């Protein structure tokens, strides 16, 4: 939870002996923002604000919310913020003439689907180098197009990933699981690498998954790549 304080200008210059009070004795606004400060198009989050009196206690006053940019809308009374279009959205909480500092959010494309790009089943020799690429793409329907800089999880699920040392790993990090970010075209790519000295498995299954910013599973998660090895 991110918090920001907004104080009336007279408070900054009046010294400790006196405070100029605004509406209903409010001299400051404490704003609560659930992290992260990134919002997908169509996603809504609840913001909170607490008017403060000169003693730092809660003051009884209505807070009005304002969206400065057209990239997001916010309910003036409830503080529910909704992403509308890609870009930066600046939000402010107000009580009378007192306004909080502008709070910025990055509005990004919504991750609507995770797809396998091209083949999902491959056959390769154990001596082949490099091994085939496993390519996925994260796509958005709002706005229509690829989703860049979004994490795709590749996880070796067969052979048993708990066996150590693993006979095969992902080439991007040398582990059995890796989160690979998508590029500007929405694609994420990895491949396999055999562990030197280990007995190659007959086949390898790699499961893909992805989540949205606040944990919702992206449709298409759970698909598999399969690589069969030949001598």
Features from the language model and the residues they span:
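Sec-dependent signal peptide recognition
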Residues: 2-10
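C-terminal motif of bacterial Sec signal peptides marking the signal peptidase cleavage site
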Residues: 12-15
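Extracytoplasmic soluble-region selector
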Residues: 17-231
């Amino acid at each position: 939870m991110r918090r920001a304080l907004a104080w009336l200008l007279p408070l900054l210059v009046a010294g400790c002996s006196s405070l100029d009070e605004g509406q209903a004795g409010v001299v400051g606004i404490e704003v609560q923002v659930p992290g992260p400060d990134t919002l997908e198009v169509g996603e809504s989050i609840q913001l909170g604000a607490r008017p403060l009196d000169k003693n730092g206690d809660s003051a009884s006053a209505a807070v009005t919310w304002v969206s400065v940019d057209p990239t997001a809308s916010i309910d003036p009374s409830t503080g529910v913020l909704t992403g509308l279009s890609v870009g930066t959205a600046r939000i402010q909480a107000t009580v009378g003439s007192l306004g909080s500092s502008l709070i910025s959010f990055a509005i990004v494309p919504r991750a609507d689907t995770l797809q396998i790009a091209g083949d999902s089943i491959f056959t390769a020799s154990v001596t082949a180098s490099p091994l085939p690429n496993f390519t996925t793409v994260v796509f958005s329907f709002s706005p229509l197009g690829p989703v860049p800089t979004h994490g795709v999880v590749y996880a070796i699920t067969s052979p048993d990933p708990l066996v150590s040392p693993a006979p095969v790993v992902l080439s991007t990090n040398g582990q059995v699981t890796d989160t690979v970010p998508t590029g500007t075209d929405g694609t994420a790519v990895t491949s396999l690498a055999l562990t030197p000295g280990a007995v190659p498995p007959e086949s390898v299954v790699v499961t893909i998954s992805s989540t949205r910013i606040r944990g919702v599973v992206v449709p298409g998660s759970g698909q598999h790549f399969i690589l069969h090895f030949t001598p």
